[in-house]
Amino acid sequence: MRRSAAPSQVLGNVAKKPRFIPPGKSNALCPKIETEETDQDVKLKEIGEKHGNASLFSEMFSENQSENFTQSVESSGKVKSTKAWNSTSKCSKLEMKTQSAPKADAMHLPTSGMAKEAAAQEEPDCLTKYFSVMWCKASKKKHKKWEGDAILITKGKSVILKDMEGKDIGRGTGYKSKELDSLEEGQTLMIGGKEIEVMGVISADDFSSGRCFQAGIATHDTVPTALPQTTMKQFCKPIKSACQPSTKENILLNPQSCKPRHNPNDTNSLVMPRPNASHQCMFNKAGLPVVDVVVDPYIANNLRPHQREGIVFLYECVMGMRVSGRFGAILADEMGLGKTLQCISLVWTLLRQGVYGCKPVLKRALIVTPGSLVKNWKKEFQKWLGSERIKVFTVDQDHKVEEFISSPLYSVMIISYEMLLRSLDQIQAIEFNLLICDEGHRLKNSSIKTTTALTNLSCERRIILTGTPIQNDLQEFYALIEFVNPGVLGSLSTYRKIYEEPIVRSREPSATKEEKDLGEKRAAELTRLTGLFILRRTQEVINKFLPPKKENIIFCQPTALQLELYRKLLSSRVISSCLQGRLENSPHLICIGALKKLCNHPCLLFKALKEKCCDPKSDEHVESSLYEGLTDVFPQDYTSDTFSEIDSGKLQVLVKLLAAIRELSSSERVVLVSNYTQTLNVLLETCKCYGYSYTRLDGNTPVSQRQQIVDSFNSKFSPAFIFLLSSKAGGVGLNLVGASHLILYDIDWNPATDIQAMARVWRDGQKCTVHIYRLLTTGTIEEKIYQRQISKQDLSGAVVDLSKTSEHIHFSVEELRNLFTLHENSSCVTHDLLECDCMGNKDHQNPSSKKPSVSRCCQLRQDQGKHNSKKPLSMSQLMQWKHFSGQHQALPDPFLERIKENVSFIFQNVTNATSPTQ
């Protein structure tokens, strides 16, 4: 505190210096008045010492309180009260008493219980308040040059100043709490080297949710009360020709001639919502007649309710009706809900119709998809619209972008992400009115070439389609939103400060109650904002249209060779060093890969072992030391080419399961999925060995042939019994309803990979009961990976985490110790974790004891409630499934009955048990 502001220093009377009093306003024009005020304060202190009662000060202080004062700021940053200048002496007296009396009270009262109690009553409650302010650098200029808006937070005697990006730009302490509590609009305050002026009060709810930082972001324009009437032009003679062109002038003169393309009053018609007055004021300045936009009945009659809702949602987004000035949308429906059909309906409608004067909204549309889905999109256009209504151009090796430019016949271009980068210069020269990105979650990294290229396109109307929206990685979530609606959430730094950091901090175990509350409110506000242009529905909306689905988690007993090799690997020096925390160069990932190969088949491990022995110059020293001594465990005559199913527990189960399907349902077919090409080679040899006809699609399959392979397999005349599928190459977007059995041979760290692969068969067009089998080796790393999957998501697959987990995961030493443990004495570690006492004889499903939470579209998956159970919520849902031990006398499922000798445990869940099937 600066003594230079004391009254005695201001008066220059150093010889007769009174006891120090906290500074008040000094006025060089009124020295006599200030001297009187100082003497008055000394008298007040003497009275206080004599009576020892704080109430006397309160009475004397309250008598001189003024009702008419305004706030001003001294250069020291203290708030002061300035009386309206009716009287100079009154002003000075009131001002000095207002500021110095409470301090004198605190300094000179005796420390009696009554005094302490009175002081406690006068102590402020330290309530936190929020204000919207303007700020600038401190100066003595009369006309300030304000540099920007900010948020002022006051609590007790301290203040924090945040800019509109959430960054702290100023802090201060030592202010008078009563003066901070009385801040009002128009008052000023010094904070550090900055001067602020209060603009208004912000509610605590607006600050907690982050709405106060959204200045101008995602707000709707004010709706005018009435639209101005269009000035009609002077009458002119009509054109004699019967074919009068529909120019803007003719439409204005004869608005009755502009009618909807289809009848909006039909019973099953799908009519788009009309724009409100604000939208018309912005986009219909010419005053064209507003016409109903009706989806072609040729399509509308085949749409399901959720698809009709999706088309309306997309229409409102791309027309700018949901968020002012933004024309993007994210359709995040689960796989199989018809995202392709909804987009085709939207494109066809906007290519032929428009809400203002019947003028079509689109001239050209660009659809970017993975290479394996280019022909599938073209096929869907032909399926729903035929080849006469619309011409679709697909870019491939034989059809270049130049042909699309030179031909007026095509209004829709379909191109793969890879081909887009090759033809980027030609694409940028074309004016597209709508951009659709299928499997758009690959755009979650804003720095990759594909995202940069698409962002640079001039098209404002953008739609992302993804069946697996990102939920946990908020920066990737921001990248998708920024692509479709740039700037709707502000800059990346603003997003991090306002949303990401509070939300992530609230999920940490050490988070305080305030941090958790703030994180929940920020997450709710982020959900509200993004809900304006993100729509997500789960597969539950079409379950009633699909046949029953039986999902089986099968735990396969490992063979003696697998157990011996597994023990040998776990005792290696590499794994021991991992468990001691030596994780340089990620040796634990090599160990995990070796254990996964062993679970699939020992021959895969043997092949890797031989490759390292034949290549001593290899820099994979860690892998070579991991395989040390494994050769002695394999039989002497063992080779990777002469493998047998007797060496792998999962392969034994697979062989028996395929035989049971062939015998019991000879007309049904199987999709066999693996994450690895080497494993697919083993499965292919197994098919050859048992004479099963097959077809295969993996990363080596040419993109131009993939759709033909899928169509051939789906045909009822297909001779193939098994479809060998690589989940990494073709597990996304393919429709394999020609099969009713799907076997997932191995497991991936990323649950989305497995869920997408399993969704290939249970979707629209499927007529038979669907059987899904997930094979896991009991007690091994595969069971641990499965537990890790279901601890992050619901078993129904409603929402998945698409953060790039893969195998580049950070593990703690404790997690690695759990992964590198072989449980030989348990029939199912997962069932043991459930603490279920059914003894593997639970042949019924329990109804959910908890009401399922209703979640909004693309809701951030924060924990909605707290539970004391150590089991994750999704893990506990396994209690609702059927539990079967391998020792079960008679399994109700005939396919499972054939394989139970090689199985230790089974979880089964049946969906749509009452649906009619063939």
From Swiss-Prot:
Listed GO biological process terms: double-strand break repair via homologous recombination; reciprocal meiotic recombination
EC number: 3.6.4.-
Domain (Helicase C-terminal) ranges: 653-817
GO cellular component, one term: nucleus
Domain of life: Eukaryota
Compositional bias ranges of the Polar residues kind: 1-11
Enzyme class, UniProt record, top EC level: hydrolase
CDD domains: DEXHc_RAD54B (cd18066), SF2_C_SNF (cd18793)
GO MF entries: ATP binding; DNA binding; DNA translocase activity; helicase activity; hydrolase activity
Chief localization: nucleus
Chain span(s) of sequence motif DEGH box: 438-441
Binding locations of ATP: D333, E334, M335, G336, L337, G338, K339, T340
Disordered: region residues: 1-29, 842-873
The keyword DNA damage is annotated on this UniProt entry: yes
UniProt cross-references to InterPro entries, sorted A to Z: Helicase_ATP-bd, Helicase_C-like, P-loop_NTPase, SNF2-like_sf, SNF2/RAD54-like_C, SNF2_N, SNF2_RAD54_helicase_repair
Keyword Protease found: no
Similarity remark: Belongs to the SNF2/RAD54 helicase family.
Protein name: DNA repair and recombination protein RAD54B
Originating organism: Gallus gallus (Chicken)
Name of the gene encoding the protein in the UniProt record: RAD54B
